[in-house]
Amino acid sequence: SPHKPEAAVYYLTELVKGGKMTAEEAERTEVYMIFRNARRMQDLQDVEGLSEEDRRAYMKKKRELRGNPLVEYANRCGFTLERAKELMDLMHDSDKGTSYYGKTRHHG
C-alpha cells in the first residue's frame, strides 16, 4: 500500500486520471499523507532507544489519542466520512476504509 508520499502521489495521479478522485481531493489527501508521514517520523524519533515494551506502549497511547484514522482523514481534509471511506478504500485497494468506518460511532 502507498505509505511513502512519493509513491502515494503517483497513485493519486492515477486515481484522478481514472476519474475516481478529483484533483482537489488528491491535493488534500497528499497534504494529509505528508503530515502523517512527518508525524510518523517524529514518533519513530521519540521511541528511539526505548525498550520494545516501552515503544509498544508509546505507540498504543499515540493511536488512542489520535482516534479513528478514517475520522482524522475526513476531518483534516474536509471530506464527509462516506467520501473519506471511499477514497481510503480506493487508495488501499481494500476495505480498510470500510473497516474503520464500521468502527465509527455514527454507524451501526
Regions found by a protein language model. Give the residues of each.
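Mature extracytoplasmic/periplasmic regions of secreted or cell-envelope proteins
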Residues: 1-108
